[in-house]
């Protein structure tokens, strides 16, 4: 793939949007088990890995994306957390650190919240929101495209990537990289 130094090409933006759509569709339309590994994930991972690699491999983001075992580990932990908290409300949990062997901490700061949106005698909805902030090392020498804002609409208006880059220095270095992913899952469950 060829990369424009001023930003993603139209076809690349479309490819990324489609990959994310496929990825989230697989999550939204499935139950607990599919969170561990789903059809759209390899395609999304492959595209993001190629994109980050084209810009250099000195960022934590690339390390995380390239570490499929860490991603699977994180998904398994998310599944366990949802199952353990069925019917409960969890306050936001903050994780810190730069340990690449743990996906939750390798992002630097991860906030996860689970909330029961609606429940009845037959079941309830669990809404899980994950906000990830990627704060790059100040000494990073990786150049990123001049892309001030990138938004992907999924199913009638949900913003999946609110900002691809929050701030850009004049030289093209990313100061902050933010992603927002929101999952709404239906969990079949009979209340006692």
Residue positions per predicted region:
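Glycine-rich short-loop/terminal segments
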Residues: 1-116, 120
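Acidic, glycine-rich flexible loop segments
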Residues: 94-152
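Active-site or metal-binding loop neighborhoods of secreted/extracellular toxin and effector enzymes
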Residues: 132-192
């Amino acid at each position: 793939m060829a990369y424009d130094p001023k930003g993603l090409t139209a076809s690349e933006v479309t490819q990324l949007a489609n990959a994310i759509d496929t990825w989230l569709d697989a999550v939204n339309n499935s139950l607990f088990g599919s969170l561990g590994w789903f059809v759209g994930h390899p395609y999304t991972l492959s595209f993001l890995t190629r994109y980050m690699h084209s810009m250099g491999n000195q960022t934590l983001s690339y390390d995380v994306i390239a570490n499929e075992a860490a991603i699977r580990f994180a998904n398994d932990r998310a599944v366990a957390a949802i199952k353990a908290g069925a019917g409960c409300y969890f306050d936001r949990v903050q994780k810190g650190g730069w340990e690449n062997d743990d996906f939750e901490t390798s992002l630097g700061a991860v906030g996860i919240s689970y909330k029961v949106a609606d429940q009845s005698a037959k079941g309830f909805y669990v809404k899980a929101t994950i906000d990830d902030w990627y704060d790059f090392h100040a000494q990073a020498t990786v150049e990123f495209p001049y892309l001030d804002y990138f938004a992907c609409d999924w199913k009638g208006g949900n913003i999946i990537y609110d900002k691809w880059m929050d701030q850009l220095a004049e030289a093209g270095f990313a100061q902050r990289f933010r992603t927002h992913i929101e999952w709404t899952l239906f969990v079949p469950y009979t209340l006692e």
